[in-house]
Amino acid sequence: MSFRGGGRGGGDRGGRGGFSSRGGRGGFGGGGRGGYANAGPPETVQPMGSFMHAVEGEMLCQSTDAKHVPYFNAPIYLENKSQIGKVDEILGPINEVFFTVKMDPGMVATSFKADDKVYISGDKLLPIERFLPKPKSLTKAPKKKGGARGGAAGGRGGFGGGRGAPRGRGGFGGGRGGARGGGFGAPRGGGRGAFGGGRGGAFSGGRGGAAGARGGFGGRGRGRGGY
């Protein structure tokens, strides 16, 4: 399995995070495809991977850092801080990461030997935890007390009685709102969040919650839809 960045720009590319096929752009991406400004070599570099073989003029490397994933377009160096290229693709499962290095002008991938080490600046790494599934919360939201009005709504929803009762219509609208917010918003947010990282989960979950709220207070509109 392979994945590319949704964008190749500088900065934190983990916003949309996840794995996708090579053709897709749903990887660790975010932003545009622009590169990093060339500010010279960093003060320190750390091992990022070892060279395996050349592929279509690029270096294929296996990550040796089990705790981090490199940014797309992050500069790659030798131990002496000489830049040789930039990260182009990230491949493989989360527990066995590979990456390719697009060579800088004058650099040739076939000039390297198997197991040659490549290095990266520490500020161009993302923690691997960012791309792992989030555990589901064990805490449950407190149930709201229904009261008499809630009872009327439940009666109508379950058996279809009391069609003309105002309380029945209000309750039915609230029910629709709850279903939309909890049923569609939460799974959609959870699904996207698990696969796509924090942004998907937060945005979709938030929208689902908002839909639920609107349904709850929009009894009139939802009630008419039911008819």
Swiss-Prot record:
Organism superkingdom: Eukaryota
Pfam families given in the database record: Gar1
GO molecular function, one term: box H/ACA snoRNA binding
InterPro entries: Gar1/Naf1_Cbf5-bd_sf, H/ACA_rnp_Gar1/Naf1, Transl_B-barrel_sf
Gene Ontology BP, a term: snRNA pseudouridine synthesis
Residue spans of biased composition, Gly residues class: 16-37, 148-227
Segments forming a coiled coil: none
Location of this chain's protein in the cell: Nucleus, Nucleolus
Region (RGG-box 2): 149-226
Keyword rRNA processing applies: yes
Keyword field: Nucleus, Repeat, Ribonucleoprotein, Ribosome biogenesis, RNA-binding, rRNA processing
Residue segments, region Disordered: 1-48, 136-227
Transport recorded as keyword: no
GO CC aspect terms: box H/ACA snoRNP complex
Region annotated RGG-box 1, chain positions: 4-35
Sequence similarity: Belongs to the GAR1 family.
Known partners and oligomeric status: Component of the small nucleolar ribonucleoprotein particles containing H/ACA-type snoRNAs (H/ACA snoRNPs).
Protein function: Non-catalytic component of the H/ACA small nucleolar ribonucleoprotein (H/ACA snoRNP), which catalyzes pseudouridylation of rRNA and is required for ribosome biogenesis. This involves the isomerization of uridine such that the ribose is subsequently attached to C5, instead of the normal N1. Pseudouridine ('psi') residues may serve to stabilize the conformation of rRNAs. The H/ACA snoRNP complex also mediates pseudouridylation of other types of RNAs. The H/ACA snoRNP complex mediates pseudouridylation at position 93 in U2 snRNA.
Protein name per the record: H/ACA ribonucleoprotein complex subunit GAR1
Gene: GAR1
